[in-house]
């Protein structure tokens, strides 16, 4: 029986496992490996940070995954040899017929001097806990949010964070004593969508949040609580950063990043195949021309699933093309959610129309999560 090994049970890995369960459950053995015991939507961290949700309430245990033909194993990958498709974990060794690397991106906070010592982030659940504790003690002052490197996961997330922070400070009666300033190395919040960028910039301005595009924080001075940029230094009482992203160490050591831009895994942009036969990469670790976001990993998984199904059945490869399509919901605060519906690769140029914030889209976002939980874990 054909064995498919999927490394990583995030958006891409879970969607791929679901697709293969639907198409080749009787013809292939699908092994899904992840070091964690549970899945968490990235946007759920905002619920923990700002909406009173507990960490346990937003975790979905992998033990609940009962997809036909799919076996979940909680293991940590220690080495990958893409030439032989040999994978070693802390518990097992594998040599599958097809290997899919969906291990996402790790964070490198130490890449920005001073950030580890004097900064906060909300991209990891541990970072959320530390920032929540800091906010509980916060009584006002200067808040800086800096995007410390590109690319990074979920491009709207820095702006969602400050909009929700604004709401919290208003509720607590602290907004009048707090300044909020966003610094980004990019020229606009969402470069592919002028409509979305305009909506976010206007939302910041309406709330008195300063926005400085094209400005990178390259270091913090922890003793002086000062952020350094080429245009000068800025004082802060609370610094929140979007840390540098990179492939996990085990992926870098495998040689899969050779030929990929900026240290990401080199892939065929149509099929997500790597230069190594039978090896594919999807999601945040792949050097595909789309943002790092779960919806694009989902779309990549569907593309790769069609290719793998043909491999399993020994039929001609289908004429597939990764489209880079996905809709991202954006928190604007006040219970309103907007949406950008992007298509990067189907046509001659990317298109990404924006849908204005509404309570209806907030309900749609909740159903987005519920539908995926049903699909990925129970079918």
Residue ranges and their predicted role:
Residues 114-139, 233-299, 306-310:
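FAD-site-proximal beta/loop scaffold in flavoenzymes
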Residues 1-71, 149-191:
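Beta1-alpha1 glycine-rich phosphate/pyrophosphate-binding loop at the start
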Residues 29, 70-87, 170-262, 316:
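A Rossmann-like FAD-binding core segment of flavoenzymes
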Residues 70-160, 164-173, 240:
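FAD-binding core/adjacent interface of flavoenzyme oxidoreductases
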Residues 2, 96-97, 236-237:
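Local beta-strand N-terminus motif with an aromatic residue
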Residues 167, 297-323:
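Internal hydrophobic alpha-helix adjacent to the cofactor/substrate pocket in enzyme cavities
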Residues 263-279, 332-344, 350:
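FAD-binding beta-loop-beta segment adjacent to the flavin cofactor pocket
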Residues 338-379:
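C-terminal auxiliary extensions adjacent to catalytic cores
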């Amino acid at each position: 029986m054909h064995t498919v090994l999927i490394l990583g049970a995030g958006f891409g890995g879970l969607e791929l496992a679901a697709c293969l369960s639907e198409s080749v459950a009787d013809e292939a053995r699908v092994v899904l490996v992840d070091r964690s015991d549970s899945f968490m939507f990235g946007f759920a961290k905002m619920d923990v940070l700002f909406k009173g949700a507990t960490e346990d309430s937003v975790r979905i245990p992998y033990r609940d995954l009962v997809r036909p033909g799919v076996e979940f194993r909680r293991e940590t990958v220690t080495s990958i040899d893409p030439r032989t498709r040999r994978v070693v974990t802390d518990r097992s060794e594998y040599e599958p017929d097809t290997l899919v690397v969906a291990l996402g991106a790790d964070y490198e906070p130490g890449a920005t001097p001073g950030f580890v010592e004097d900064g906060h982030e909300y991209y990891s659940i541990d970072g959320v806990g530390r920032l929540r504790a800091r906010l509980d003690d916060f009584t006002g002052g200067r808040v800086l949010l800096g995007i410390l490197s590109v690319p990074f996961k979920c491009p709207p997330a820095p702006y969602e964070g400050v909009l929700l922070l604004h709401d919290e400070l208003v509720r607590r009666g602290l907004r009048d004593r707090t300044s909020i300033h966003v610094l980004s190395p990019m020229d606009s919040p969402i470069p592919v969508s002028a409509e979305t960028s305009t909506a976010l910039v206007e939302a910041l301005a309406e709330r008195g949040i300063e926005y400085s595009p094209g400005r990178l924080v390259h270091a913090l001075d922890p003793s002086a609580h000062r952020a350094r940029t080429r245009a000068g230094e800025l004082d802060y009482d609370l610094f929140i950063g979007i840390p540098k992203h990179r492939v996990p160490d085990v992926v870098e050591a495998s040689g899969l990043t050779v030929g990929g831009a900026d240290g990401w895994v080199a892939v065929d942009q149509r099929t997500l195949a790597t230069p190594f036969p039978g090896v594919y990469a999807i999601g945040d670790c792949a050097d595909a021309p789309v943002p790092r976001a779960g919806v694009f990993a989902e779309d990549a998984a569907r593309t790769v699933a069609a290719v793998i199904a043909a491999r399993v059945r020994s039929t001609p490869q289908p004429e597939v093309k990764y489209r880079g399509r996905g809709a991202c919901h954006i928190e604007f605060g006040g219970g309103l959610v907007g949406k950008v519906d992007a298509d990067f690769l189907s046509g001659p140029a990317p298109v990404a129309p924006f849908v204005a914030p509404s309570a209806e889209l907030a309900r749609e976002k909740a159903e987005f999560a519920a539908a995926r939980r049903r699909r990925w874990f129970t079918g």
